[in-house]
């Protein structure tokens, strides 16, 4: 067991239950775990010593919502959207066609590159989804690929999103027969979660229930895309199924907020203990890219609901892995404090993946996921938006950047 002392930390944001922010601090890492946290002057000896020279350190980002398995380019579609023009050649179908045509090696190379970009920006725990295959064979291929990358430690959580969209030329109910039958059977050993896009133009409440029920029966956890396009049944279905998270949440009724808040009655936010409810996943980069209303993170937090921030990296509506950007946006545009935004991008994401006992905060015994900023304090994430502030990253105890 080899130990490393990371010291000379100007500001250490722990996101622990006390919300401690330490100054002149140090962390000791043993193998892949945190072994000690405290004042630098009291730090124990270690095999190796790394000085961060007066920089700030916080937990690595937990990106709880991404779509990394894709090929193709949709920049013309984005340009048209920014100009307020229609673009008939766009949409998920474009990505599906390009992704189906790509070889396994090509897709693996693309995913590796996107993960590398994410880690270079401070992300240390990643969820990603299938959903650009939309046939039994392709969804199974993408799930196998992601499971292999998970074994390598490149991604951490794999989600089955066969119910992303009804493919062109398919009847919705006929397609769902595939999703809950042979498609689910082919991916269940590779995925930990089932997801559905429950919204206008995708799947309605009953269709969503059908997929989620099948996923639960197959042993998968539940997450959901909901209430992105308009206020609808997504949040209600997520609560009904005890989903770990419902993501997008741009359009919420008072009843939606009340329902989400009701799932958190067994959770004590101050001590970060108890039974977590359904996390409200906010995706600000996507909201900006689609010129949608920003998700009401302030309203959700004030109602007692845990919120996550995630990149939603995908080729159509949020082609970025930058969690720094999302955190800065949450402070500048969504009325979160820095502490709230950092918590949402770390512990909030971990709660939405039910991984809060392993990651999401800097505490003894947790995975050593550290993000060192090229700045003396974490507020620089919002104070200096768009700047390349990631200086170093430890992921599971190993220096990754």
Curated annotation (Swiss-Prot):
**A Pfam short name:** Amidohydro_1
Please give the pathway this protein is involved in.
Amino-acid degradation; L-histidine degradation into L-glutamate; N-formimidoyl-L-glutamate from L-histidine: step 3/3
Q: Does the keyword Metal-binding apply?
A: yes
Q: What detail does the entry give on cofactor binding?
A: Binds 1 zinc or iron ion per subunit.
The molecule here is called: Imidazolonepropionase
Q: Supply one GO BP term.
A: L-histidine catabolic process to glutamate and formamide
Family per record = Belongs to the metallo-dependent hydrolases superfamily. HutI family.
Binding-site list for Zn(2+): 65, 67, 225
Q: Does the keyword Hydrolase apply?
A: yes
- Tell me the organism: Micrococcus luteus (strain ATCC 4698 / DSM 20030 / JCM 1464 / CCM 169 / CCUG 5858 / IAM 1056 / NBRC 3333 / NCIMB 9278 / NCTC 2665 / VKM Ac-2230)
Where is N-formimidoyl-L-glutamate bound in this sequence?
Answer: 132, 314, 316
Taxon lineage: Bacteria, Bacillati, Actinomycetota, Actinomycetes, Micrococcales
Q: Which cell locations does it reside in?
A: Cytoplasm
Main location class: cytoplasm
- Entries under PANTHER family matching the protein: IMIDAZOLONEPROPIONASE, IMIDAZOLONEPROPIONASE-RELATED
Q: What's the Enzyme Commission number for this chain?
A: 3.5.2.7
Leading EC class: hydrolase
Task: List required co-factors.
Answer: Zn(2+); Fe(3+)
GO MF annotation terms: imidazolonepropionase activity; iron ion binding; zinc ion binding
| Positions that bind 4-imidazolone-5-propanoate | 74, 132, 164, 228, 317
Give Gene Ontology CC terms.
cytoplasm
Which UniProt keywords are given for this protein, alphabetically ordered? Answer: Cytoplasm, Histidine metabolism, Hydrolase, Iron, Metal-binding, Zinc
The record lists Fe(3+) as bound by: 65, 67, 225
Fetch the NCBIfam families from UniProt.
hutI (TIGR01224)
Q: Which gene encodes it?
A: hutI
């Amino acid at each position: 067991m080899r130990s490393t002392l990371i010291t000379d930390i100007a500001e250490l944001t722990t996101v622990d239950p006390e919300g401690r922010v330490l100054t002149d601090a140090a962390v000791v890492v043993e193998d892949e775990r945190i072994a000690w946290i405290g004042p630098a002057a009291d730090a124990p000896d270690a095999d190796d010593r790394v000085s961060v020279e007066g920089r700030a350190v916080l937990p690595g980002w937990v990106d709880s919502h991404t779509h990394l398995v894709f090929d193709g380019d949709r920049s013309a579609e984005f340009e048209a959207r920014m100009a307020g023009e229609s673009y008939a050649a766009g949409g998920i179908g474009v990505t599906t066609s390009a992704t189906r045509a790509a070889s396994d090696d090509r897709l693996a190379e693309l995913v590796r590159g996107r993960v590398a970009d994410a880690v270079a920006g401070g992300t240390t725990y990643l969820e990603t989804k299938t959903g650009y295959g939309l046939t039994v064979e392709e969804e199974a291929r993408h799930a196998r690929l992601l499971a292999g990358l998970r074994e390598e430690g490149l991604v951490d959580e794999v989600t089955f999103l066969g119910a992303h969209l009804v493919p062109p030329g398919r009847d919705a109910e006929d397609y769902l027969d595939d999703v809950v039958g042979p498609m689910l059977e082919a991916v269940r050993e590779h995925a930990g979660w089932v997801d559905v896009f429950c919204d206008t133009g995708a799947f309605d409440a009953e269709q969503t229930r059908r997929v989620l029920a099948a996923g639960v029966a197959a042993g998968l956890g539940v997450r959901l895309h909901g209430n992105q396009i308009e206020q609808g049944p997504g949040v209600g279905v997520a609560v009904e199924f005890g989903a770990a998270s419902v993501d997008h949440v741009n359009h919420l009724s008072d009843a939606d907020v009340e329902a989400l808040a009701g799932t958190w009655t067994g959770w004590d936010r101050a001590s970060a203990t108890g039974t977590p409810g359904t996390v409200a996943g906010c995706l600000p980069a996507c909201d900006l890219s689609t010129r949608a209303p920003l998700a009401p993170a302030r309203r959700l937090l004030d109602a007692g609901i845990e919120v996550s921030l995630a990149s939603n990296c995908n080729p159509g509506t949020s082609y970025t892995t930058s969690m720094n950007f999302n955190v800065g946006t949450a402070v500048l545009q969504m009325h979160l404090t820095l502490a709230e935004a950092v918590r949402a991008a770390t512990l909030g994401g971990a709660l939405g993946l039910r991984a809060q006992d392993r990651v999401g905060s800097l505490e003894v015994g947790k995975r050593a996921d550290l993000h060192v900023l090229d700045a003396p304090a974490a507020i620089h994430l919002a104070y200096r938006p768009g700047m390349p502030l990631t200086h170093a990253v430890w992921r599971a105890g190993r220096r990754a950047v």
